[in-house]
């Protein structure tokens, strides 16, 4: 049955933007039918061309802005919006912070938790050039090996040298490595024919240490001219202390493969976080915005209310960043992580920092919690920093039955945070302090936050 829509593809309309979606798109309505529009801000009057319609909503492109928002700023370049690198760059930074605070508050209000206080988002003095890691695809464009970023929802590589939100030293390193690979006629990966050699260039740089790692991801085990390529990278980039070839032979969108070959230097780089030193490998999960991560983790430590006598469980412990920073303020910390290399890194990092009261186990968070519960481990505080999908129901059940006094929830997805808070309520936990958003990813809609739950006595 054909649905009668109030707009059709190709139609040009004058509309007023009412709001922003959680993805940062402007929303206009025609007869209560929403149109989602990139590069449009609330209260702007625009001319929009409808590009796609569905039964429940449409998408459109801005043809002309007829009344400009006072909060609009001149974007640095269209390419950052087209690729999704910086989809909020047209919104002034103070308003980005308000938008993120509002997003979190609105999600709580939708489930009738209007009484939850959400504090203003903690921002950055310089909300650009903050990322300490880049993973840049390599493809053949107009006959030569090229680096850049994909246009959104496409396989079209857009050549880029300045990524705007990355450490400029990393941007420079990518260009240097690209030019060396061009010089020696290395073949770029062709994803359609699964041919060619160079798939991705990854660069990590320590914010404090300035140590740099270059990872060349290849389809083949053999990297032609590997020795001379490595020597030239080291000569051109004195900060490089680690050059690694990562082999990913599968036809996949996953960036890194399972095999790392150290071509020069170390297998890891070091960096500091809240006074501790961490070894970071090619595969390590390590927060990409070190300045904001220190604020985020210090907040989590403060909210945990540690006096030095507590037992803490750190679920999703990664390379031990939260576990080890908390271990300095607790009696004992137990960390769990499902990635073997991360557990190895966590144990090395404990040794590196002389920390003896942190124990790390390789397992899923859900299974480890059940085992600790069976073994009679009684945590005072549980810290969680889950992926975007949030916490598993079995994990929350185990956590609730272990009955810690406090749960500190570091969230990268406010939707799953709100869902999980409701699940914790079934075990007698309530939010005991205002929720604090932290802007880990300026110029994007992504939101991190810290929430504290306490058990009702």
UniProtKB/Swiss-Prot annotation:
UniProt keywords, alphabetically: Methyltransferase, S-adenosyl-L-methionine, Transferase
Entry annotated with the keyword Transferase: yes
GO biological process, one term: rRNA base methylation
EC top class, as a word: transferase
Record domain TRAM: where: 6-64
Binding site for S-adenosyl-L-methionine: 287, 316, 337, 385
Record field: transmembrane: none
UniProt EC number: 2.1.1.-
Top-rank lineage group of the source organism: Bacteria
Family the entry assigns: Belongs to the class I-like SAM-binding methyltransferase superfamily. RNA M5U methyltransferase family.
Name of this chain's protein: Uncharacterized RNA methyltransferase lp_1151
Organism: Lactiplantibacillus plantarum (strain ATCC BAA-793 / NCIMB 8826 / WCFS1) (Lactobacillus plantarum)
